[in-house]
């Protein structure tokens, strides 16, 4: 049996019903115990990111990232890509550095453990 870890806090998940997050972590980070869906594949995100960069409505900076809004509905909680002023910043892996997101998550966790203040952070799986 493989050890599953929460994609927010990194601690082991012992609840058989939990898939990728502790209920408490999900409630704190997403505002709901329901896990939001991110209905995009990597190829779709890359195309959306290109169009947003060309129209100058992406989040500025060196690392590829998008602004996303978390929409809560009766049926499902879902992330949607917005130009600016989203609720979250989604950072994307690149072909050159495919594990950059996991490395940054580790860095944020380590900083928090050292007592440094950080922005809230979590890993979210893409549909692909």
Predicted regions and their residues:
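Conserved ATP-binding subdomain of kinase catalytic cores across diverse folds
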Residues: 45-128
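Regulatory N- and C-terminal appendages and interdomain linkers associated
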Residues: 1-46
């Amino acid at each position: 049996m493989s050890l599953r870890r929460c994609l927010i806090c990194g601690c082991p998940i012992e609840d058989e019903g939990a898939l990728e997050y502790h209920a408490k972590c999900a409630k704190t980070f997403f505002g709901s115990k329901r896990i939001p869906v991110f209905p995009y594949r990597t190829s779709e995100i890359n195309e959306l990111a290109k169009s947003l960069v060309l129209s100058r409505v992406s989040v500025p900076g060196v690392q590829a990232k998008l602004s996303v809004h978390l929409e809560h509905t009766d049926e499902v909680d879902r992330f949607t890509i917005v130009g600016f002023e989203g609720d979250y910043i989604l950072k994307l892996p690149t072909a050159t550095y495919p594990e950059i997101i996991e490395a940054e998550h580790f860095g944020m966790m380590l900083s928090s453990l050292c007592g440094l203040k950080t922005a809230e952070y979590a890993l979210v799986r893409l549909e692909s």
